[in-house]
Amino acid sequence: MVNLRNAVHSFLVHLIGLLVWQCDISVSPVAAIVTDIFNTSDGGRFKFPDGVQNWPALSIVVIIIMTIGGNILVIMAVSMEKKLHNATNYFLMSLAIADMLVGLLVMPLSLLAILYDYVWPLPRYLCPVWISLDVLFSTASIMHLCAISLDRYVAIRNPIEHSRFNSRTKAIMKIAIVWAISIGVSVPIPVIGLRDERKVFVNNTTCVLNDPNFVLIGSFVAFFIPLTIMVITYCLTIYVLRRQALMLLHGHTEEPPGLSLDFLKCCKRNTAEEENSANPNQDQNARRRKKKERRPRGTMQAINNERKASKVLGIVFFVFLIMWCPFFITNILSVLCEKSCNQKLMEKLLNVFVWIGYVCSGINPLVYTLFNKIYRRAFSNYLRCNYKVEKKPPVRQIPRVAATALSGRELNVNIYRHTNEPVIEKASDNEPGIEMQVENLELPVNPSSVVSERISSV
């Protein structure tokens, strides 16, 4: 209690000094608290060099807050919005958890190291733990993006096979595998660091991974290999989407073998259609023209939706690539050219590039906000403290008919304006399938006009 009281007193004193004597301050409030609580043996309180202020550190605090807050919004959106309940968004929520933990556990300690001029101010046993968390969450980010890329490619390439194994439980299992791989990559660091402090300290003061073999192997396993898989699968996904769109535009479709369910198709029945049935040539031409006109409608919309989703994910992939590649490339070069390279320059570059990678954790929520209406609307509601889930209007269901009673025959379900009750009639034998005829009850139309909906009987 005495140490805590002294720490609070020290914080208030230095905060007043920061507000009143900004130009003369020599100790930051955060540094004062840490020094008073831990009473480290590294010596005294931190002092900025002459002429240097702590405003860059304050800007980093803003980045940390935005990273934590933005990823919390993503987690809330996926948890509360039913439209976002799918495998890809579950992966994005898990990715947001990793990014949020970067803002909570990794970035503040890195900021603390900057305040102390990269002299580790905390107990030394915490250094390998902090490095392990850094590697864990960074690896989890790239593994999540790699898993998303693979999952979407399989879903677009083999939709039927993917739908059989695509459920919430399966998505959670895949996410668990991603986290298991990330933990497996990061666990050796505390073991190595606690056995030999030289593996995690440079010049016995700076907390940084100092094992060349682990740096090389870890960089390839945790970054370059998943990055290669991610780029290849994303390019293949774009190729498949373009090929499917071109085939639809030219009137060709790829139908998987076996049974398939047709989408609900609506058309108006008129007397001209019955007249054309008497002429086989005209009837055949009409069917071809009708089939060609209505084929792309639902499928093209699905492909457009996939393109939009792929565009958003592509931006996320590109941002991650641009912001983390400099760090890992410099990290590899610092090991390969240990003697020929300027190590001081390499250390300065790594200190800058690692923060560029950290900023990537806070950019993803901005990407979702700019390019996805559902996320944008959800974020807007949450920021206004509106957490109500939209309820869909009740849907009136038509009584179901047992499949065994159909036997390939057609049933006409007519809902008339004056009764609002369905009347089921058996149709003729020469028109197989199921036909539901529902009169429009809302719009002022001719009572004789009936909308016909045909569903394939499988």
Swiss-Prot record:
Motif PDZ-binding, residue range(s) on this chain: 456-458
Signal peptide range: 1-32
Extracellular membrane side: 33-55, 112-128, 190-213, 337-347
GO BP terms, alphabetized: behavioral fear response; chemical synaptic transmission; feeding behavior; G protein-coupled receptor signaling pathway, coupled to cyclic nucleotide second messenger; locomotory behavior; phospholipase C-activating G protein-coupled receptor signaling pathway; phospholipase C-activating serotonin receptor signaling pathway; regulation of appetite
Sections of the chain in a coiled coil: none
Localization per Swiss-Prot or TrEMBL: Cell membrane
Major subcellular site: membrane
GO cellular component terms, semicolon-separated: dendrite; plasma membrane; synapse
Presence of keyword Isomerase: no
Region (Disordered): 274-301
Pfam family of the protein (one): 7tm_1
Disulfide pairings: 127-207, 337-341
Binding-site residues, ergotamine: 139, 209
Function recorded in the entry: G-protein coupled receptor for 5-hydroxytryptamine (serotonin). Also functions as a receptor for various drugs and psychoactive substances, including ergot alkaloid derivatives, 1-2,5,-dimethoxy-4-iodophenyl-2-aminopropane (DOI) and lysergic acid diethylamide (LSD). Ligand binding causes a conformation change that triggers signaling via guanine nucleotide-binding proteins (G proteins) and modulates the activity of downstream effectors.
Family: Belongs to the G-protein coupled receptor 1 family.
Subunit comment: Interacts with MPDZ. Interacts with ARRB2. Interacts with MPP3; this interaction stabilizes the receptor at the plasma membrane and prevents the desensitization of the HTR2C receptor-mediated calcium response.
Stated name of the protein: 5-hydroxytryptamine receptor 2C
Protein source organism: Pan troglodytes (Chimpanzee)
Gene: HTR2C
